[in-house]
UniProtKB/Swiss-Prot annotation:
GO MF annotation list: xanthine phosphoribosyltransferase activity
Broad class of the protein's primary localization: cytoplasm
Entry EC no(s): 2.4.2.22
Xref: HAMAP family: XPRTase
Keyword Glycosyltransferase attributed: yes
Protein name: Xanthine phosphoribosyltransferase
Superkingdom in the source lineage: Bacteria
Protein family according to the UniProt entry: Belongs to the purine/pyrimidine phosphoribosyltransferase family. Xpt subfamily.
Species of the source: Streptococcus uberis (strain ATCC BAA-854 / 0140J)
Gene name linked to the record: xpt
Any single Gene Ontology cellular-component annotation: cytoplasm
């Protein structure tokens, strides 16, 4: 997605050798115009998949996921990273390691929101090592639902997340694919949409 790549170049900051900070439009402050465009692109990419639910993980995946769900006209569910006292029964869980935060969390979704008839599109802000998406896939499979694809706003293609997900038989669609970081700059490779 050319518009997204241009925005990353304009407003993204490379930190070290493998961190991209995009807090001015995605991970802290949200540009809803850009998110709406992102939602439309993912909806077009999965228009024929019969998606019934969009699933993400809190927190930075929520903004793009809401706009994808809006464009597909389906509900959006986000996995919670912290146990809520109101979630007392029928909980689907998985362990997820965060590359950015360097911590493992138990994420959960109430089972009443997913059924064996659901066709799910997972949406997330970043793909690095694939652990967040893998955890969401585990939760969706616990419900007996099917994963139709994983939509990623920004993929760090130099890390092994895509390979992990494709080895699991999951279609990955990334709107911006970063080939590498070089001298504080980033290089893109061809995106999926």
């Amino acid at each position: 997605m050319k518009l997204l790549e241009e925005r990353i170049i304009k407003d993204g900051n490379v930190l070290g050798e493998n961190i991209l900070k995009v807090d001015s439009f995605l991970t802290h402050q949200v540009d809803y115009h850009l998110m709406r465009d992102i939602g439309k692109v993912f909806a077009e990419s999965y228009a024929d998949a019969g998606i019934t639910k969009v699933v993400t993980i809190e927190a930075s995946g929520i903004a793009p996921a809401v706009y994808v769900a809006e464009a597909l006209k389906v509900p959006m569910i986000f996995a919670k990273k912290h146990k809520n006292i109101t979630m007392t029964e029928g909980i689907l869980t998985a362990e997820v390691y965060s590359f950015t935060k360097q911590v493992t969390s138990t994420v959960s979704i109430a089972s009443k929101f997913l059924s064996k008839d659901d066709k799910v599109l997972i949406i997330d802000d970043f793909l690095a090592n694939g652990q967040a998406a893998k955890g969401l896939i585990e939760i969706i499979q616990q419900a007996g639902a099917s994963v139709e694809g994983v939509g990623i706003v920004i993929e760090k293609s130099f890390q092994d997340g895509r390979q992990l997900l494709e080895n699991m038989g999951v279609k990955v669609t990334s709107l911006a694919r970063i080939k590498n970081f070089e001298n504080g700059r980033l290089n893109f490779m061809e995106a999926d949409a």
